[in-house]
Amino acid sequence: MRAYFYDGLPGDQRLPHDSGKPVNVDDLLAIGVYYYHLPELESVDNLARDRGYKNRDEITVSPKTMGDVYESKVKMFFAEHLHEDEEIRYIRGGRGYFDVRSKDDDWVRVLLEKDDLLILPAGIYHRFTTDETNYVHAMRLFKEDPKWTALNRGPEVDNNGHRQEYVKTFLAEPAQ
């Protein structure tokens, strides 16, 4: 895993867009994002049990597996959105980028590779893309039945209860 501020320059979303400003694991924790490197599947199973993840599936994002819909899917994943549930991804192969919003609403890019696991809290704005190899194989873990409802960023979604709880927990300044 490597995390850094996104450079904001135009160009292919699958390129690194590395600003040269690193972000560490503690910075990610401060916005509710958990990172683990778990080379053994048993460790993933233990984490799933401890956090109450009852269901899982696997997805391979690549032109070979998705065919003609690959480009449109990658564009859809890259639209800024949130979920009303935690998003848990364990990378089984390939590489991908999760971009998450910092406390200052800047993009933080997190490069994930094989054996990396990332947990995004409900309500955090984020987006995803493969890297320039156009291949990632990931396990998705869920607390309940698998669902993937993306709510794209906008004024209505800013007022969503899960978003408001996230803001209160991770972004609001402490009362003086």
Curated annotation (Swiss-Prot):
Can you quote a single GO CC term?
A: cytoplasm
Instruction: Report whether Magnesium shows up as a keyword of the record.
Output: no
Catalytic activity line of the entry: 1,2-dihydroxy-5-(methylsulfanyl)pent-1-en-3-one + O2 = 4-methylsulfanyl-2-oxobutanoate + formate + 2 H(+); 1,2-dihydroxy-5-(methylsulfanyl)pent-1-en-3-one + O2 = 3-(methylsulfanyl)propanoate + CO + formate + 2 H(+)
Cleavable signal peptide: none
Keyword entries, A-Z: Amino-acid biosynthesis, Cytoplasm, Dioxygenase, Iron, Metal-binding, Methionine biosynthesis, Nickel, Nucleus, Oxidoreductase
Gene Ontology terms for molecular function = acireductone dioxygenase (Ni2+-requiring) activity; acireductone dioxygenase [iron(II)-requiring] activity; iron ion binding; nickel cation binding
Principal localization? cytoplasm
Alphabetized Pfam families for the sequence: ARD
| Co-factor: note | Binds either 1 Fe or Ni cation per monomer. Iron-binding promotes an acireductone dioxygenase reaction producing 2-keto-4-methylthiobutyrate, while nickel-binding promotes an acireductone dioxygenase reaction producing 3-(methylsulfanyl)propanoate.
Binding residues for Ni(2+): H81, H83, E87, H126
One Gene Ontology term of the biological-process aspect is: L-methionine salvage from methylthioadenosine
Its pathway?
Amino-acid biosynthesis; L-methionine biosynthesis via salvage pathway; L-methionine from S-methyl-5-thio-alpha-D-ribose 1-phosphate: step 5/6
The cofactors required by this protein are: Fe(2+); Ni(2+)
Binding annotation for Fe(2+)? H81, H83, E87, H126
Domain of life assignment: Eukaryota
Q: What is its EC number?
A: 1.13.11.54, 1.13.11.53
| Subcellular location, record wording | Cytoplasm; Nucleus
What's the family?
Answer: Belongs to the acireductone dioxygenase (ARD) family.
What job does the chain carry out? Answer: Catalyzes 2 different reactions between oxygen and the acireductone 1,2-dihydroxy-3-keto-5-methylthiopentene (DHK-MTPene) depending upon the metal bound in the active site. Fe-containing acireductone dioxygenase (Fe-ARD) produces formate and 2-keto-4-methylthiobutyrate (KMTB), the alpha-ketoacid precursor of methionine in the methionine recycle pathway. Ni-containing acireductone dioxygenase (Ni-ARD) produces methylthiopropionate, carbon monoxide and formate, and does not lie on the methionine recycle pathway.
Question: Protein name, please?
Answer: Acireductone dioxygenase
As recorded in Swiss-Prot or TrEMBL, the protein's gene is named ADI1
